[in-house]
Amino acid sequence: AKCGSYVVLNHVVGGGPGEEIFTQVSGITIEGGKYQCDDPAVICKSVNSDILIDGAEVHSACGVLVKSRINDDPCAPNPEGRDVYGIHVTLRNMNTENSILHEDEKRKMTLKLENTALVGAITGGVLLTLDAGSRWTANGDSSVVLNGDVSLQQLDALDGVTVTAVGAEDKTVTLPSGGTLVVYPPRGSAFDPAE
């Protein structure tokens, strides 16, 4: 399918009083198919979301698969002081060259790769989980929290690219394609999942 700007725009605006606006979670599932768009394929603006992209071929002209950001609508609800659900993305059965950009600092994002090879930047301190059949190559500077059993063999970064990650131990490693992985334990940083 040739889409205009994006494949999915997901956002919320307040229609009145009530806490439901902060607890609602939208579900987005894209199974199979081919999609072309100019902007990020899936855009989440100040909204809690469960996103599954399974076996789809997505070509974004700007090179971004999922982007979260603060809603610029003046009626957008502000979750300040609330522990909101966040944005949970699963990429399954994919080989994709697109980035994941998390710019909504009012909620957290998780990314699970299941039988997926991802080439792209991951920004904003995304909590990243890779199953044994998945691999990530960063093609732009990235910031993540490594979750679960992630082996160095599953990670790569292009020459000149730095991946900053919260993980189990302090280490700096040169990856196979020449990029650098800098890992440090949680210490109250912007990427700390305990925050």
Where are these regions (language model features)?
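Beta-strand-rich solenoid/repeat architectures in extracellular/passenger domains
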Residues: 1-6, 12-14, 25-38, 54-66, ...
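All-beta strand scaffolds that present successive hydrophobic residues in beta-strands
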Residues: 9, 24-32, 48-55, 72-79, ...
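Low-complexity, polar/charged sequence tracts that form flexible coils or short amphipathic helices
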Residues: 21-22, 35, 43-45, 82-83, ...
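Internal alpha-helical scaffold/solenoid segments in large eukaryotic proteins
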Residues: 38-39, 49
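Ankyrin repeat (ANK) tandem arrays and their immediately adjacent linkers/low-complexity segments
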Residues: 65-71, 102
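Extracellular beta-strand/loop-rich repeat segments of large surface/secreted proteins
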Residues: 101-195
